[in-house]
UniProtKB/Swiss-Prot annotation:
GO terms for cellular component: cytosol. GO terms for molecular function: ATP binding; RNA binding; tyrosine-tRNA ligase activity. Transmembrane segments: none annotated. Its EC number is 6.1.1.1. The lineage of its organism: Bacteria, Pseudomonadati, Pseudomonadota, Betaproteobacteria, Burkholderiales. It catalyses: tRNA(Tyr) + L-tyrosine + ATP = L-tyrosyl-tRNA(Tyr) + AMP + diphosphate + H(+). Residues 351-411 form the S4 RNA-binding domain. It comes from Burkholderia thailandensis (strain ATCC 700388 / DSM 13276 / CCUG 48851 / CIP 106301 / E264). Belongs to the class-I aminoacyl-tRNA synthetase family. TyrS type 2 subfamily. It is found in: Cytoplasm. Catalyzes the attachment of tyrosine to tRNA(Tyr) in a two-step reaction: tyrosine is first activated by ATP to form Tyr-AMP and then transferred to the acceptor end of tRNA(Tyr). ATP binds at residue 246. This is Tyrosine--tRNA ligase. The gene is tyrS. One of its GO terms (biological process) is tyrosyl-tRNA aminoacylation. Its main location: cytoplasm.
């Protein structure tokens, strides 16, 4: 089935196309419309013309974490099938601020923030994508030239009633929480990106489904063949509760040091581990099922967690780094102090323990420091600190918070 206005003929669905479709569907939440996408794949195979696969990311923060790589991994799989990947940096839409999943207006970024964040975005994404097979675009290329006249014409193509079909907008409207007019523009501008790029498929998280469908509708209005849409699940953070987010502190950045990345991955629950295998591992589903069977048969879950952590560390660093990270983790687990801990010099002795931990960079706040003390997670030279009112005298010592955070502190008066 095809929605192309020129009604192109159907192409045969071969075993090769079925395989490509199976690769595409691995781990996805939804592929709309599957029959249309199968025809796009078949046409591409018959004509030798690659599909145009679009992924837009707003540079709202300078770092990419593992949650972002769920959709990047899918892009790489499609790239390996021979299709053109368009890595779209939303430098224009970042000025608006994506309201998806928000219960309040998202503050737009400044041009300076956007440019600073965008500099490192693709360099990190290229750790997943094939740099040579990736087309990099900025949506300011076609959005800025629209001007007021073009923006008004674009806005006329969608109604407020349709916008209020979005769950987050509906909840805010019913709850009396303000919705700014500029927030309605975001889905329209993202949809217009698909028109400008003539996309065959657009990828996004499940929270992006409405925006992706707007792109499909706008393409129809502009006389283009409609894109299919593919949504990927949102990866849970290290806590296994909320989606991975830097602001929530439950993330693993792909630029983190190997030891830190490895340690964080080893901290996830045994249940969450299998979710990470499905969404982050490049192992086949059959192999993952076999490993899971071994776990259910009594093998220690730690063995599989080590496999996962090593695979991910090796992907973003090297196999040698992954091996060293495992050695470091085992050393710490036995109570040892890592060799590469930071050295910090502080003044003000005697210094309150909460302030010492914060100033040493081991915790973000004194309240977090006190919480760790309550839980027995703070040690000085191997001795557990239990007194939240402790004043630390001048000297040199190793301070530890939790299993992974260390600092060699020199405290002076």
């Amino acid at each position: 089935m095809s929605t192309d206005p020129t009604s192109k003929p159907a192409f045969p669905i071969t075993d090769e196309i079925r395989h490509a479709l199976a690769v595409t569907k691995r781990g996805v939440d939804e592929l709309l419309i599957e029959e249309e996408f199968a025809q796009k794949l078949a046409r591409s195979a018959a004509t030798g013309k690659p599909l145009r696969i679009k992924l837009g990311l707003d540079p709202t923060a300078p770092d990419i974490h593992l949650g972002h790589t769920v959709v990047l991994n899918k892009m790489r799989q499609l790239q390996d099938l021979g299709h053109t990947v368009i890595f779209l940096i939303g430098d224009f839409t970042s000025l608006i601020g994506d309201p998806s999943g928000r219960n309040a207006t998202r503050p737009p970024l400044t041009r300076e923030q956007i440019e600073s964040n965008a500099k490192t975005y693709f360099e990190q994404a290229a750790l997943v994508l094939d740099r040579e097979k990736t087309e990099i675009r900025y949506n300011s290329e076609w959005s800025m030239p629209l001007g007021a006249d073009g923006m008004i014409k674009l806005a006329s193509r969608y109604t407020v009633a349709r916008m209020l079909e979005r769950e987050d907008f509906t909840k805010r409207f019913q709850g009396g929480i303000p919705i700014s007019i500029h927030e309605f523009l975001y889905p329209l501008m993202q949809g217009y990106d698909s028109v400008a790029l003539n996309a065959d498929l657009e990828l996004g998280g499940t929270d992006q489904k409405f925006n992706l469908l707007v792109g499909r509708e706008l393409q129809k209005q502009y006389g283009q063949e409609q894109q299919c849409i593919l949504t990927m699940p949102l990866l849970e953070g290290l806590d296994g509760v909320e989606k991975m987010s830097k602001s929530k502190g439950n993330y693993v950045g792909i630029g983190e040091k190997p030891n830190d990345m490895f340690g964080k991955l080893m901290s996830i629950s045994d249940v969450l581990m299998w979710r990470y295998f499905e969404l982050l591992s490049f192992r086949s589903l059959d192999e993952i099922a076999r490993l899971r069977g071994e776990a259910e048969g009594g093998r220690n879950p730690r063995d599989f967690k080590v496999m996962l952590a090593q695979e991910i560390v090796a992907r973003f660093h090297s196999q040698a780094d992954a091996e060293r990270a495992l050695e470091d983790f085992n050393h710490r687990a036995k109570g040892g102090v890592p060799d590469d801990i930071p050295t910090v010099t502080l003044a003000g002795a005697p210094l309150a323990i909460g302030q010492l931990l914060k100033q040493a960079g081991l915790v973000p706040s004194t309240s977090e420091a006190l919480r760790n003390i309550e839980q027995g997670g703070v040690k000085i030279d191997g001795a557990t600190v239990s007194d939240k009112a402790l004043k630390v005298d001048a000297g040199e010592f190793v301070v530890q918070v939790g299993k992974r955070r260390f600092a060699r502190v020199t405290l002076t008066a």
